[in-house]
Amino acid sequence: MPKAKTHSGASKRFRTTGSGKVVRQKANRRHLLEHKPTKRTRRLDGRTVVAANDVKRVKKLLNG
């Protein structure tokens, strides 16, 4: 059987932590930030853990 390839789109969007959690960037912080409140842009900063229902699917794409 051939080697499984990592899904290149998923590898750019998700990372696995040392403890095995899958993390992602938060949405709505790319552009058009001028009219969004500073409070909202701060809240959308940084990474967050992927929802429990999606973890299995994402790990499969990452061959994890």
From Swiss-Prot:
InterPro entries: Ribosomal_bL35, Ribosomal_bL35-like, Ribosomal_bL35_CS, Ribosomal_bL35_sf. One of its GO terms (biological process) is translation. GO terms for molecular function: structural constituent of ribosome. Pfam families: Ribosomal_L35p. Keywords: Ribonucleoprotein, Ribosomal protein. One of its GO terms (cellular component) is cytosolic large ribosomal subunit. Residues 1-45 are annotated as: Disordered. Residues 1-15, 23-42 have a biased composition (Basic residues). Belongs to the bacterial ribosomal protein bL35 family. This is Large ribosomal subunit protein bL35. It comes from Mycolicibacterium vanbaalenii (strain DSM 7251 / JCM 13017 / BCRC 16820 / KCTC 9966 / NRRL B-24157 / PYR-1) (Mycobacterium vanbaalenii). The gene is rpmI.
